[in-house]
Structures are given as structure tokens and as C-alpha cells.
Amino acid sequence: MKLLVCISKAPDTTSKIAFTDGDTKFDENGVQYIVNPYDEWYALVRALELTEANGGTVTTITVGTTTDDPTIRKALAIGATDAVRVDAEAKDPYFVAKQIAEYAKANSFDIVLTGKETINYNGAQIGSMVAEMLDQPFVSLAQKLEVSGNTATLERDVPGGAEVVEVNTPFVLSAAKGMAEQRIPNMRGIMAARTKALNVIPAIETAELTSIVSYSMPPAKSESKYIDADKMTELVEILHNEAKVI
């Protein structure tokens, strides 16, 4: 089994977020990065579980620069067989998807796995674009994945229940919560990942179809009010006069 897992970095949720150049650029000063959780906890770990049970390899692919190397090595420490970095800034989703699709096309993977979205942009576009470019089936928001031979069975939530999908390889999926459990790398994996060579390849020429106009912070949340359980009259007055919901 030959699996390709798409890996990207995302700011740690404890990092302070700021913008520069008239709010047109993300200020990376002091920002700590992590592997995007949907890529790491679900797509990568499930891929590793499958190859541990059935044999095979797990390759990660990242579109990025040397600033992405620490998160790539985290994926290697967790257990990925090898890692590819397309040497380019991750621009718009089409650009990123094109780089991944071209590499996947040239290397014939059984399954391409992505996280359902990144926690910084929440775009959820890469998986479907890659599938379209490869002319392969795409299963989104998968929460379970089992493989037998060249047939895979996937499950995902739908309103009121669950949907079970059966698809033949090769195909592309986006992994959601429930696909696997977070795996903490051990010291042996961390040490091995430090010296493992990364396969850095040039980007192919691809048009950018979108661009960032500006960034903005979400509006500040209003302060919460706490009402004692024995002051129902005060609560009713607030709901009526301030919130205007009754």
C-alpha cells in the first residue's frame, strides 16, 4: 500500500496573531507553528495504522519553504516513511493542489489523504481539487477508513445518521475527527527524524487564481453577565430590555 499524506503548518493557537503592511500580510514574528491537527492526528496517523497492519509506505508532501521543515520533521518523527517538500510559498489553494496532484500523478499512490481543513484558513479545498486534477474519486469528511485489497470502506456523519461509502483505489479523501487518535512521537522517532533527508523538489509553474486582499481580526466579544439563580426577575429584564429576545 502506497499512501500520500498532505501536511501543512498552522499557527499554534497560543500564538499572538497580528498583521502588517496595511493588514495585507500575516506577521510571523514570534509565531510558533504546529502541524495542522487535521493533517497530523487524523490523516497521517490513520495512514500509518493502515501500513502497519497491511505493509506499505507513507509519504508526506508539503508545499512550503524551509520554515516548514520543523513541522515536516514532526511528521517523520511520528512515523512517516519519507517526506517531500515542494520548494515554494503556499500561495492560493489551486497552486498548492496543483503541486500535490502533479507529484501524486508521477508516483502512483493508492490513496491521497488530507485533513478536512487547516485551522488557520478553514478552506477545505485542497482535497477536492487534487481529486479533480487526478480524475479520481473524492470522499470528504471521512471519519473511518478500512482497506481490503483495492477496496476501501469509509464512514462519515450525515444529518440524522452515518453514511458508509465503498470506493476502489486510487482515490482521495479528507479526514475528519474520529479517523484516528493523536500519536505522540517517541524519542527514537524524534532523533531519527532530525537526520533524515527531506526530498525537496522545485515547484511547477502554475497560475495563482486568488490572492489575499486583506486580513482582519474578528470583532471583540462582549462581556458576559452572570446572574444568580435566585434573581430570575433581573434575568428576565436583561433578556427583554438588553438582549431583546423576549
PLM regions and their residue ranges:
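N-terminal glycine-rich FAD/FM-binding segment characteristic of electron-transfer flavoproteins
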Residues: 1-246
